[in-house]
Curated annotation (Swiss-Prot):
Keywords: Chromosome, DNA-binding, DNA-directed RNA polymerase, Isopeptide bond, Magnesium, Metal-binding, Nucleotidyltransferase, Nucleus, Phosphoprotein, Repeat, Transcription, Transferase, Ubl conjugation, Zinc
Region feature (Bridging helix): 827-839
Name the record gives this protein: DNA-directed RNA polymerase II subunit RPB1
Modification after translation: The tandem 7 residues repeats in the C-terminal domain (CTD) can be highly phosphorylated. The phosphorylation activates Pol II. Phosphorylation occurs mainly at residues 'Ser-2' and 'Ser-5' of the heptapeptide repeat and starts at the 3- to 4-cell embryonic stage. This phosphorylation also occurs in the early stages of oocyte development and is not detected in oocytes arrested at the meiotic diakinesis stage. In the somatic lineage, phosphorylation at 'Ser-2' is mediated by cdk-12 downstream of cdk-9 whereas in the germline lineage cdk-12 phosphorylates 'Ser-2' independently of cdk-9.
Function: DNA-dependent RNA polymerase catalyzes the transcription of DNA into RNA using the four ribonucleoside triphosphates as substrates. Largest and catalytic component of RNA polymerase II which synthesizes mRNA precursors and many functional non-coding RNAs. Forms the polymerase active center together with the second largest subunit. Pol II is the central component of the basal RNA polymerase II transcription machinery. It is composed of mobile elements that move relative to each other.
Region (C-terminal domain (CTD)) residue spans: 1592-1848
Native source species: Caenorhabditis briggsae
GO cellular component, one term: RNA polymerase II, core complex
Extra information: The binding of ribonucleoside triphosphate to the RNA polymerase II transcribing complex probably involves a two-step mechanism. The initial binding seems to occur at the entry (E) site and involves a magnesium ion temporarily coordinated by three conserved aspartate residues of the two largest RNA Pol II subunits. The ribonucleoside triphosphate is transferred by a rotation to the nucleotide addition (A) site for pairing with the template DNA. The catalytic A site involves three conserved aspartate residues of the RNA Pol II largest subunit which permanently coordinate a second magnesium ion.
Length: 1853
């Protein structure tokens, strides 16, 4: 009997490591089933033995069977064959490795070329013990230089190079053969060997082509020891196996033939290839046998080599691709594996799945947010396997009867033996009788849990759990709010739905992935969903000031509010008629005690300060106190997706379920209001008034005129270029500015003209659709169209379109659209507009692919990073990435933005607000009540405590300002203290005007105690203490400053009670916010970074400002950072200055000049070469004067200079700009050319700055002829010098820095923040230099540069200059810049995790294949990313082992990955199991089929030996739930109970738990310690275990499933498995924690035949009991299980037996002979007289029977108020462990106990039994039965021990 829940398959073991290796020829033969030797496939229409479709290799067609394993098409996995190659060939995948190994070993003797005892080799072996790949690389580096086999040491003829090698000294023994080694080269798929010239080999050619055969011989000689040294493995991967001698032929299942109708079979590509190989192989064998010429054989071998190579890889560079006849390239094995569609990524990492549906989505605002409307057709098609149990058998039977055609029905029944019954084709489904243990695949029904998903799945909120609601028609319906996390809209989007197939999965989705649980995203700690669309628009309209609702409409709205408590609020206006405001309606929707302060979107900032800041004239301050909307218009700022808004607060304060309902209620109520109120939009809304249009036209006319002026200026050269820009750029920037200004101005005037009631405006203001710019484009003017960030470029000759004149730079021709959408665009405007739009589309398409790849890489790099149980963040190799997640160990979901009250204020304010002065009596009396003042004055340590608090606060402030030197950090911490204080004030009704009774000493001690409880890192060693201090530092600072004594008594005014509540609340919230172990934070971080990247715009924006510097931003920059690219697009330094240079622009300019690279070219005006033979009398007129002066005192020999002259004229303006002098330049020239060039130059103040250079020639004494030649060369030479000087002569600066811009920042982020003497923050605008190009090291060494703040944006450079920690911070800063540039925000912990992953190893790991795949993770993970086949080949060569720890590996192997709920094991406490309670597994119909299948075979279980009624029963064992062992309703149960009858506590053997055949024995609580029902064995005073003892009552407050007394049905016990189909969490009738109720117990199930409350005398195990036998009496002597007439299959024992029907009349509830089979105990049936509340021995008021008493020890043993005959030693007087208040018959939630049930009318005198499983039709319990009547004297609600409010019996539970 297999486990229920597993179709009958072989049990699977988990793979815990994967060993890679190469298949050796022997192994291939051993695993082969067929020797393939013929290329043919069929012979005479039959598959040919030994052919390529050998029937031993697998099944060929659907009807066939496999000859090896006799399986059919679905069962047979296929079997390998083999084919032997005539000659060995290279394996193309191992060719480069073979080459490397050849170079490491001797070509003749196969020894290693270096000595293993060499210290360097030893060192390598030691270093690379776990890394064979690295070992080969290092050994190869040592070997490749060797040209002789080692050990030629003692040859006489002084051999080259290695004699003097220190490694050879003192070595005498010859290790190798001493022969020369060839050098090897790979050509295509051949290897060539070549020897050096001096080789004295026996007349051998110097160059040969190495055959695979020869290489094989070399490899075979390598010893095992050497194999290990070269990083291979003698067992799994020997070098000789890298050469193919035997090829495995893949099974048929891998290469199925494609059968096309009507034509022949098309064979698979692999089959084609194999047939080529076989043909070539046969030809080679034939030729070899016939003794063909050598070159013929060589050609054959090469052909064979080619075919074998292209079988593996068909994309080898330098080889023709193998093709089919049609010319299509064949798909080789390598192509099958690699890429997105390949085996690994396409079939192992991601698969197509069953039980999924896909259709279009539509909106339905009336559904709750976690519900999805599913079309009936889909619901009828998707099924859920439900296990039949006695509780749901009738319900499922009903579904089975309906079959597959009607909804709701069922599709299949799966019997216990795994047989499937398809109800679609079953002739009479109604005849199929279900038995417990069967599985019914029923249709999806309302309330099922599903997973809903929309691609692209960018973050975890793209797959969420929903509940099903079956609706008509064919689309998925979903709530509008849920569209935003899915990023869905209803313009035709499709979504996928997956129906989980096990209860475990359902439980997991329900507890982790449901929509309400994902309301807040950890990405940015804010809600992911808000109110959208019409509801948002309406909520703003409804909460405006003048919205009134009359009585009927109010009633109508209240009807839409499910949480309405029945009280109509007081109307705001009473006369003339009652009217409610919209705000009041909104207040009704707000749940609970919520306090929020927000602003409306139109809130003017000026209102926040000033005398009237409490009054909001425009009603723009949204104030919600205690769940009442007091003021303000609600818009998207309050109910949108922003952090800290109403939805966020509700979710944090009141939990996810209430928040989810809040979303739904807002929508239902407000849509109902909108439906009546209406909202529309039409052309009327787009029309402004006449004056506005005039205004707009004037603005545009003026703008055009301005542009014309600028063009004029540019033409006349009056336009000054801005620094760093050319004239043209400056002009364009100016024009752009004018035109954008014009658009904005027209837009704002258009908006001003719109009235408050304009519908466009109402949508924009509420935030539901559109923005200001949309309005202005519709009404005023569309504005400038841009392409690539510039105006429309000239496309025709010097113009944009043919209708414009050439060189028209005016607004119209360059794409300014002056019309509005309303007015309509002219054709040329339309064309330009289309150009702009097209660019956007292209951009989006390109961006999607880019960011998709970035996201994939991020995920792959971080997929296995998770929080461990020790709180650290580690990857799959257990390498630490972070000590605590996010450095504070908190989950991103529970933190909020908070501000530090002590950071900003200056010293005076700080002291005023935070310093408590206990000596100031006036202050104390004003703020504290008398007794507190007295306490303060009496306390000895009061003053010192308060003083220590103040010094702590000062220290905190100092630290804060050190941590956040800018004073503006966005601090995210859990527990929003301001709001908690506000809540406390509301809950405890704090009066802010009264003095408080909260002692400051109590505050200080309370806060200190609390901060000790906030533990992130536990442990007492120094490191743990330091880590704990670091992790909680900010939280503690916040706590101490917010909850300081001064604040508490002045602003918060909490009383002692409220303060204590506050501390408790903070502690709870903090604990809740700690990150959960198992949380996959890596994937989360990758998604949180990838998702905003997708929203980023791709192209780089050039923002024109003061600094005209271009900065790469957006996706390209993100790529640069995570690729760690060496070549940045725009490398740049930001140089901060110190001292005078920072303040004084002139000094700053000095530094700039020092940095900026200046060549001669930059300062040169023009150059010329003259022939000027006489130096003194120059031919250049303007130079004459100064040259003659210069030569009056010649400083060098004029005779030797060349007649050719290079004259350079410099630009004075630039010289001054660069702070250069002529002297400096002359020095540079002299430095560069020395004595070869004569230079004379003008003075710095001369009119023109001129340099004259001549080449210093030889003496003039040479002949004229030669001179002429020289002269010719001179001028050419001069030309070269000129070119060289202009470009290469560095005058000053750093060559890498091409340009430096100088600017003074106007925003705070670049300013220097200083702390003033008063203690406030002040931003100082220093001069900043920004450079193009970087040279950080050089710049840092310059003077007047602030070395601390100067940074580079090139992370590689920072790494080289400043090291790994600096680069970590730098990456974080750069990433943050990229993300925050377009206003996104990502929580710090995600960025930090990425930075840590990139730098954890001490070097920069790029997020590319070069970084990710160079980690030491398993080969399977690496191959799932990129370079699939190469990695697998490498792994097999080095015989790597994959430990299968990561996520990818487990997914490939189909195992549960060690992450999330899979990252821990559950351990069974065997000791506890001894106290378990056994459920008889074998009472019904044939073994414990519902016991989760733990019972053995039916026959064994039913054998009489296992059910001893009276046979040899020891007193210690009492039958599981039944007072008599079996279910015998023996007379012994009559209240007069004879002690030796069947009910005697001493012989209740039942299925004794120790019975060897009973697998559940181990769990049985009835071991001797807890045995029997007799007082001797189980005395009421036993402290241990009774079902109603508080330890064991699930509803009892002290009951916890982990309680030591309880291990019965805890989730760890095998009999209780959430996946057991009978255990349905939604089952109303049972409490899963009730140990006495095991859902899987057969004996206890209302629908189980053995336990039918309506058949008193029916015991399924009684052989003599045939339901139709009239003479059968429960006390019949023939009732013995050993009776031969009893057989479970006997016809009389049939569940369908006519009289065994739940309505069987033979059952009378008061039958004394019937021991009611109450679900948790046959012994307890409320309607059975044996247990009658009025029975003296069982009286609830008896002190001994107290459901809450831990021991049943009566306080006075003989006293029982209503039981005169009560005797504490009576075996009856124990509270039966079988009776549990949570048992279904006795549980208000049980179907058989429903107050609304017709039978349960307290006045119902009669009691009609009716089918057991319909809720509310209990057969056991009639409230009016005298034995159990609330009016019965012994059961009085006032009875202390048994009152309905007693914790164990709670009607609400």
């Amino acid at each position: 009997m297999a486990l229920v829940g597993v179709d009958f398959q072989a049990p699977l073991r988990t793979v815990c490591r994967v060993q890679f290796g190469i298949l050796g020829p022997e192994e291939i033969k051993r695993m082969s089933v067929a020797h393939v030797e013929f290329p043919e496939v069929y012979e005479n229409g039959k598959p040919k033995m030994g052919g390529l479709m050998d029937p031993r290799q697998g099944v060929i067609d659907r009807r066939g069977r496999c000859m090896t394993c006799a399986g059919n098409l679905t069962d047979c996995p296929g079997h390998f064959g083999h084919l032997e190659l005539a000659k060995p060939v290279f394996h193309i995948g191992f060719l480069t490795k073979s080459l490397k190994i050849l170079r490491c070993v001797c070509f003749y003797c196969g020894r290693l070329l270096i000595d293993k005892t060499n210290p360097r080799v030893m060192d390598i072996l030691k270093k690379t013990s776990g890394n064979p790949k690295k070992r080969l690389a290092l050994i190869y580096d040592l070997c490749k230089s060797k040209s002789v086999c080692e050990g030629a040491a003692e040859k006489e003829d002084g051999l080259p190079d290695d004699m003097d090698d220190p490694m050879n000294e003192g070595k005498k023994v010859p290790a190798g053969c001493g022969r020369y080694q060839p050098s090897y080269r790979r050509v295509g798929i051949d290897i060539n060997a070549e020897w050096k010239k001096n080789v004295n080999e026996d007349t051998q050619e110097r160059k040969i082509m190495l055959t695979a055969e020869r290489v094989l011989e070399v490899f075979k000689q390598i010893t095992d020891e050497d194999i290990l040294v070269i990083g291979m493995d003698p067992q799994f991967a020997r070098p000789e196996w890298m050469i193919c001698t035997v090829l495995p032929v893949p099974p048929l299942a891998v290469r199925p033939a494609v059968v096309t109708f009507g034509s022949a079979k098309n064979q698979d590509d692999l089959t084609h290839k194999l047939s080529d190989i076989i043909k070539t192989n046969q030809q080679l064998q034939r030729n070899e046998a016939n003794g063909a010429a050598a070159h013929v054989l060589t050609d054959d071998v090469r052909l064979l080599q080619y075919h074998v190579a292209t079988l593996v890889d068909n994309c080898i560079p330098g080889l023709p691709t193998a093709t089919q006849k049609g010319g299509r390239p064949l798909k080789s094995i390598k192509q099958r594996l690699k890429g997105k569609e390949g085996r690994i990524r396409g079939n192992l990492m991601g698969k197509r799945v069953d039980f999924s549906a896909r259709t279009v989505i539509t909106a339905d605002p009336n559904l709750p947010i976690d519900t999805v409307g599913v079309p009936r057709t889909i619901a009828q098609n998707l099924t859920f396997p439900e296990i039949v149990t006695p509780f749901n058998v009738d319900k499922l039977q009903e579904l089975v009867n309906r079959g597959d055609t009607q909804y709701p029905g069922a599709k299949y029944i799966i019997r216990e033996n795994g047989a499937r019954v398809d109800l679609r084709y079953h002739p009479r489904a109604a005849d199929l009788h279900l038995q417990p243990g069967y599985r019914v695949e029923r249709h999806m029904k309302d309330g099922d849990i599903i997973v809903f998903n929309r691609q692209p799945t960018l973050h975890k909120m793209s797959m969420m759990g929903h509940r099903v609601k079956i609706l008509p028609w064919s689309t998925f319906r979903m709530n509008l709010s849920v569209t935003s996390p899915y990023n869905a809209d209803f313009d035709g989007d499709e979504m996928n739905l997956h129906l989980p197939q096990s209860l475990e999965t359902r439980a997991e989705i329900e507890e982790i992935a449901m929509v309400p649980r994902q309301l807040i995203t950890p990405q940015a700690n804010k809600p992911v969903m808000g109110i959208v669309q019409d509801t948002l628009c309406a909520v703003r309209m409804m909460t405006k000031r003048d919205i009134f609702i009359d009585w009927p409409f109010m009633m109508d709205l209240l009807m839409y509010l499910p949480t309405w408590d029945g009280k109509v609020p007081q109307p705001a206006i009473l006369k003339p008629k009652p009217l409610w405001t919209g705000k009041q309606v909104f207040s009704l929707i707000i749940p609970g005690n919520v306090n929020v302060l927000r602003t409306h979107s139109t809130h003017p900032d000026s209102e926040d300060s000033g005398p009237y800041k409490w009054i909001s004239p425009g009603d723009t301050k949204v104030l919600i106190e205690h769940g009442e909307l007091l003021s303000g218009i609600v818009c998207s700022k309050t109910v949108g997706k922003s952090a800290g808004n109403l939805l966020h607060v509700v979710a944090l304060e009141l939990g996810h379920e209430i928040a989810a309902n809040f979303y739904s209620h807002i929508q239902t109520v407000i849509n109902a209001w909108l439906l009546r109120e209406g909202h529309t939009i039409g052309i009327g809304d787009t029309i402004a008034d006449q004056s506005t249009y005039l205004d707009i036209q004037n603005t545009i006319r003026k703008a055009k005129q301005d542009v014309v002026d600028v063009i004029e200026k540019a033409h006349n050269d009056d336009l000054e270029p801005t620094p760093g820009n050319t004239l043209r750029q400056t002009f364009e920037n100016k024009v752009n500015q004018i035109l954008n200004d014009a658009r904005d101005r027209t837009g704002s005037s258009a908006q001003k003209s719109l009235s408050e009631f304009n519908n466009f405006k109402s949508m924009v203001v509420s935030g539901s659709k559109g923005s200001k710019i949309n309005i202005s484009q519709v009404i005023a003017c569309v504005g400038q169209q841009n392409v690539e960030g510039k105006r429309i470029p000239f496309g025709f000759r010097h113009r944009t379109l043919p209708h414009f004149i050439k060189d028209d730079y005016g607004p119209e021709s360059k794409g300014f659209v002056e019309n509005s959408y309303l007015a309509g665009l002219t054709p040329s405007e339309f064309f330009f507009h289309a150009m702009g739009g097209r660019e956007g589309l292209i951009d989006t398409a390109v961006k999607t692919a880019e960011t998709g790849y970035i996201q994939r890489r991020l995920i792959k790099a971080m997929e296995s990073v998770m929080v461990n149980y020790d709180g650290t963040v580690r990857n799959s190799l257990a390498q630490m990435v972070q000590l605590r997640y996010g450095e504070d160990g908190l989950d991103g979901m529970w933190v909020e933005n908070q501000n530090m009250p002590t950071m900003k204020p200056n010293n005076a304010v700080f002291e005023r607000d935070f310093r408590m002065d206990l000596t100031d009596n006036k202050f104390l009396r004003k703020n504290y009540s008398e007794d507190v003042v007295r306490e303060i004055q009496e306390a000895q340590d009061g003053i010192s405590l308060v003083e220590s608090e103040w010094s702590q606060l000062e220290e905190d402030r100092r630290l804060l300002r050190k941590i956040f030197p800018r004073g503006d950090a966005k601090i995210v911490l859990p527990c929003n203290l301001q709001r908690l204080i506000w809540n406390a004030q509301k809950i405890f009704k704090v009066d802010l005007r009264k003095p408080v009774n909260l002692s400051p000493l109590h505050v200080i001690n309370g806060v200190r105690e609390l901060s000790k409880k906030l533990i992130i890192v536990s442990g007492n060693d120094e490191i743990s203490k330091q880590a704990q201090y670091n992790a909680t530092l900010l939280m503690n600072i916040l706590l101490r400053s917010t909850l300081c004594t001064k604040k508490m008594c002045t602003s918060a005014k909490l009383n002692t009670e409220a303060f204590d509540w506050l501390l408790g609340e903070i502690e709870t919230r903090f604990q809740q916010a700690i990150a959960q172990p198992g949380e996959m934070v890596g994937a989360l971080a990758a998604q949180s970074l990838g998702e905003p990247a997708t929203q980023m715009t791709l192209n780089t924006f050039h923002y024109a400002g003061v600094s005209a510097k271009n900065v790469t931003l957006g996706v390209p920059r993100l790529k640069e950072i995570i690729n760690v690219s060496k070549q940045l697009k725009t490398p740049s330094l930001t140089v901060f200055l110190t001292g005078a240079a920072a303040k004084d622009p002139e000094k700053a300019k000095d530094v700039l000049c020092k940095l900026e690279h200046t060549t001669l070219k930059k300062v040169t005006c023009n150059t010329a070469i003259y022939y000027d033979p006489d130096p003194k009398n120059t031919v250049i007129a303007e130079d004459e004067e100064w040259v003659s002066i210069f030569y009056e005192m010649p400083d060098h020999d004029l005779t030797r200079t060349s007649p050719w002259l290079l004259r350079i004229e410099l630009d004075r303006k630039r010289m001054v700009d660069k702070k250069l002098t002529m002297e400096m330049i002359a020095d540079r020239i002299h430095g560069g050319f020395g004595q070869d060039v004569h230079t004379i130059y003008t003075d710095d103040n001369a009119e023109k700055l001129v340099f004259r250079l001549r080449i210093a020639g030889e003496d003039k004494g040479a002949e004229g002829q030669e001179e002429q030649v020289d002269k010719m060369e001179d001028d050419v030479f001069l030309r070269c010098i000129e070119a060289n000087m202009l470009s290469d002569l560095t005058l000053q600066g750093i060559p890498a820095i091409s340009k430096v811009y100088m600017n003074q920042p106007n925003t705070d982020d670049k300013k220097r923040i200083i702390i003033t003497p008063e203690g406030g923050f002040k931003a100082v605008a220093d001069w900043i230099l920004e450079t193009d190009g970087t040279a950080l090291l050089r710049v840092l060494s310059e003077r007047q540069i602030d070395p601390v703040r100067t940074t580079s944006n090139d992370i590689c450079e920072i790494f080289e200059v400043l090291g790994i920690e600096a680069v970590r911070k730098s990456i974080e800063k750069e990433m943050d810049n990229v993300i925050s540039f377009d206003g996104s925000y990502v929580n710090y912990r995600h960025l930090a995790l990425l930075c840590d992953v990139m730098t954890a190893k001490g070097h920069l790991m790029a997020i590319t294949r070069h970084g990710i795949n160079r980690q030491e993770v398993g080969a399977l993970m690496r191959c799932s990313f990129e370079e699939t086949v190469d990695i697998l080949m490498e792994a097999s060569v080095h015989a790597e082992v994959d430990p299968v720890k990561g996520v990818s590996e487990n997914i490939m192997l189909g195992q549960l990955a060690r992450c999330g709920t899979g990252c821990f094991d559950l351990v069974l406490d065997v000791e506890k199991c001894k106290h378990g309670m056994e459920i008889p597994q074998n009472v019904v119909m044939g073994a414990g089929i519902y016991g989760g299948g733990f019972a053995g075979s039916p026959s064994r279980e039913f054998s009489p030996a296992h059910s001893p009624w009276n046979s040899g029963v020891t007193p210690n064992y009492s039958g599981p739930w039944s007072p008599t062992g079996g279910m015998s309703p023996s007379a012994g149960f009559s209240p007069a109970g004879n002690l030796d009858g069947g009910a005697s506590p001493f012989n209740e053997g039942g299925w004794s738990p120790a019975s060897p055949g009973d697998p559940l024995g181990a769990l049985s609580p009835r071991t001797p310690a807890y045995g029997g029902m007799s007082p001797g064995v189980y005395s009421p005073a036993s402290p241990g275990f009774s079902m109603t003892s508080p330890h064991y009552s699930p509803t009892s407050p002290s009951y916890s499933p982990t309680s030591p007394a309880h291990h019965g049905q805890s989730p760890v016990s095998p009999s209780y498995s959430p996946t057991s189909p009978s255990y349905s969490p939604t089952s109303p009738s049972y409490s899963p924690t009730s140990p006495s109720y095991s859902p899987t117990s057969p004996s206890y199930s209302p629908t189980s035949p053995s336990y039918s409350p309506t058949s008193p005398s029916y015991s399924p195990t009684s052989p003599s009991y045939s339901p139709t036998s009239p003479s059968y009496s429960p006390s019949s002597p023939r009732y013995s299980p050993t009776s031969p007439t009893y057989s479970p299959t006997s016809p009389t024992y049939s569940p369908t037996s006519p009289t065994y029907s739940p309505t069987s009349p033979t059952y009378s509830p008061t039958s004394p002979s019937y021991e009611g089979y109450s679900p948790s105990s046959p012994k307890y049936s409320p309607s059975s007289p044996t247990y009658s509340p009025t029975s003296p021995s069982y009286s609830p008021t008896s002190p001994q029977y107290s459901p809450t008493s831990p021991q049943y020890s009566p306080s006075s043993p003989t006293y029982t108020p209503s039981s005169p005959t009560y005797n504490p030693t009576s075996p009856r007087a124990f509270s039966s462990p079988q009776y549990s208040p949570t048992s279904p018959t006795y549980s208000p939630t049980s179907p058989s106990y429903t107050p609304s049930s017709p039978q349960y009318s307290p006045t119902s005198p009669t009691y009609t039994p009716s089918p057991a499983d319909q809720p509310g039709t209990s057969n056991q319990y009639s409230p009016s039965s005298p034995t159990y009547s609330p009016s019965s004297p012994t059961y009085s609600p006032a009875s202390p021990s048994y009152s309905p409010s007693s914790p164990t019996y709670d009607p609400q539970n």
